[in-house]
Amino acid sequence: MIMSLSILYILPEILLALGVIVVMFSGLFLHGKIRNINYIFFQVFTLLALIATFAKEYLIQTTGLVFEGQVVFSGFAYTLQLVILVLAVFVALYSRDYVKDRKISDGDFYTLLMLCVLGAMVLTAAHSLVTIYVGLELLSLPMYALIAIYRDSGKGLEAAIKYFVLGAIASALLLFGMSFVYGMTGKLDITEIANVLAHGNFAGLQQQFLLVYLVMMIATFLFKLGAFPFHMWLPDVYQGAPNAVANIVATIPKVAAFAMLVNILFVGFPSLKDSWIYLFRIIGILSIFFGSLVALSQTNVKRLLGYSTVSQIGFVLLATTLNPQGYALTAASFYVIVYLFTTLAVFGVLTTISVGGYEVQDLNDLKGFNTKDSWLAFILLIVLFSMAGIPPFGGFIAKLFVVMGLINDGNYFLACFVLFMAVIASFYYVRVIKTMYFDDPDNDETVKPPLTSLIALSINGLVLLFLGIMPMLLLGVLTQVTNVI
């Protein structure tokens, strides 16, 4: 494919890279001269990238590779890239007043955020071991800086160091696994690796070593997702990071990590599916069990959300093990998207109300929240209902598809286990609702969220309701784009 045409396939990434440069220089030379200029530049370039990605998805109806197999263009990649960009727009919107209130450099904040978005976009479309590693580092490095960006918070620095150390170990595991896979196959392209494994003579000890190398690679992305037992960093980072940054950590990297798991497992290593499918079931079960039980004892809201994430990711991993493959990928993708928008809304509410000295950390901070802002409390109620899997919200449909898939596969015991743990998990969501609606507030501080955040949060809540009432619209798109993987 000619170079000029190939560049069109990465136009969104080019726009984001240009946006990084513009926001960085804007932060240096225009800071304080034009109100919200860095925020405006961020949203403009992100929306341009969103439009370019949307146009690509509907103008390009084929799947293929560009740049010598380094980048894949497919409906699946474009759909997840659209999700990343929508998340970025909402995260920035929720964060605008929070960043100003905490006197965080908005130039630094939006530059680092856009770098994270760019890294996630690259990682989602990566089709080569080299591109995967570059995308991962482009996503991770600015994330470490973002977690520690609020200089007045010692917990933020501690969380950043912990995340950096564990992230470095995860990256090293990925490199080790990649180098061994390259040594055995002589290929960097994921599709070519799959072809070598399918037609090569890999048996006995060689196949066992290959499985070990695969585990080393996917451990990195399980770490980014926060699955058990790679979750150690997650509650601490959620708690220590500023609320606006916690929203970023909880959403954008999850999309890219999920995309890479799908590409590596279903495109690169389908020949080892009989082995990794059992591994994912075990990790999924342990994630649901551990995350749900530990969350019950949490009094810090963000730590509770951290352990809740571990449990939710367990459902995603179980979904990837279902049959047939098209159903598995559709169910897992739908669950991920619903999870992302519920998490976006929860942290969006926490970020929006954590302005003017009112910082939400513990459950006690939400006592009587309904009396302070009944509309925000209602939105949070909707989101928590969705997380708990209560109809008619998107979370119910997402969990239902996983349970139905397990039943169709004959895994009745596992389906009963998932249902039981979903009931257990609902207790800690209900506890938050009870605190908001039935406990008396500890203080008389008022909450005055900006109108733009209220509108965005309302849209966020409507999306979750829409996904519960009319899920087939999104499921139809996901079925179409996952069938060609």
Curated annotation (Swiss-Prot):
Q: Which UniProt keywords apply?
A: Cell inner membrane, Cell membrane, Membrane, NAD, Quinone, Translocase, Transmembrane, Transmembrane helix, Transport, Ubiquinone
**UniProt keyword annotation of Metal-binding present:** no
Membrane topology qualifier: Multi-pass membrane protein
One Pfam family here: Proton_antipo_M
Write out the catalysed reaction.
a quinone + NADH + 5 H(+)(in) = a quinol + NAD(+) + 4 H(+)(out)
Any keyword Chloroplast? Answer: no
Output the GO biological process annotations, alphabetical, semicolon-separated: ATP synthesis coupled electron transport
- The EC designation for this entry is 7.1.1.-
Q: Which InterPro entries match?
A: NADH-Q_OxRdtase_suN/2 (IPR010096), ND/Mrp_TM (IPR001750)
Q: What is its main location?
A: membrane
One MF term in the entry's GO annotations: quinone binding
Q: State which residue ranges cross the membrane.
A: 10-30, 40-60, 71-91, 107-127, 129-149, 164-184, 209-229, 248-268, 276-296, 304-324, 336-356, 377-397, 410-430, 454-474
One GO CC annotation, please?
plasma membrane
Instruction: List the subcellular locations.
Output: Cell inner membrane
Q: Describe its partners and assembly state.
A: NDH-1 is composed of 14 different subunits. Subunits NuoA, H, J, K, L, M, N constitute the membrane sector of the complex.
Purpose: NDH-1 shuttles electrons from NADH, via FMN and iron-sulfur (Fe-S) centers, to quinones in the respiratory chain. The immediate electron acceptor for the enzyme in this species is believed to be ubiquinone. Couples the redox reaction to proton translocation (for every two electrons transferred, four hydrogen ions are translocated across the cytoplasmic membrane), and thus conserves the redox energy in a proton gradient.
The family classification in the record reads:
Belongs to the complex I subunit 2 family.
Matches recorded under PANTHER family: NADH DEHYDROGENASE
HAMAP family, A to Z: NDH1_NuoN_1 (MF_00445)
Task: Please report the name of this protein according to its UniProt entry.
Answer: NADH-quinone oxidoreductase subunit N
